[in-house]
Amino acid sequence: YTMGTKRIDVVREQAKYEIAIDRFCKEKGGYIGIVDHFGALHGLNQLPGLAIQDLQSKGYGFGAEGDWKIAALGAVMQYMADQKGTGLMEDYTYDLVDGTCLGAHMLEVSPQFAATKPEIQVHPLGIGGKSDPARLVFEGIAAPEAVAVSMIDMGDRMRLIVQKIELVKYPHKMPNLPVGGLMWKYKPNFKEGVAAWIYAGGAHHTVVSSVVTAQQMVDLGNMWGIEVVLIDENTKIEQFKKDLMWADVVWKNKR
């Protein structure tokens, strides 16, 4: 990392969080998935940012805002990916002209995604009511094949949503984005890819991986015995909607 701040005390605070969380997880049972919430940071001066980024780089799964499903899924996918190119992600905004999605999070994007050397920076965070947190800032990698994966609770079953994506480089510098990020294009295309994600109930938290394949995730879901929804280059939205409807009937009759 490079140091982009003189506020060393803020960085040291994050180092304390990283050491403490890692030690707690190892001593209390070897946990490999963690969550936090910006509204429940009792005793902490900052939202863990740099700390969580480093822990993800070591293979921990992380779920923001208490998202335990993503933490668990991330831990499994980190293992599958040998701790490379995998981590928490969130849809931030769409570029309707280029048909791309900018993915990021308030702090905790894994440096496994870094295409540029991550820089430690300190900026205000207008949520949570805590002190300015340290975080790593970088531009994300490009990769022709990647997946964005969401796990949702359907009430009577879990659904694993797997979407093929292409990671692309930033079209230009983003000096006002003080976090790490990724950009991607949806399969089969922007319009149908976004529609399919919404129809399937895809959440805004995902685990993105440039290492784990869509087929591996489909196989994993089948091994777990849960519903798997795949969105790829062959997806046709009208047929996709029918498939979701029939799957709902089938899964309800499996109980």
Question: What is the predicted function of each stretch?
Answer:
Residues 1-21, 76, 227-235, 245, ...:
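Non-catalytic structural scaffold of enzyme domains
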Residues 1-47:
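A charged, amphipathic alpha-helical module
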Residues 28-31, 84-91, 230-235:
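Flexible, glycine/charged-enriched surface loops at secondary-structure junctions
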Residues 37-44, 94-96, 213-214, 238:
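Gly/Ser/Thr-rich loops at beta-strand to alpha-helix junctions
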Residues 44-49, 99-103:
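Short acidic, glycine/serine/threonine-rich loops at helix termini
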Residues 46-63:
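A short, gly/pro- and small-residue-rich
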Residues 133-255:
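Extended hydrophobic packing segments that form well-structured cores
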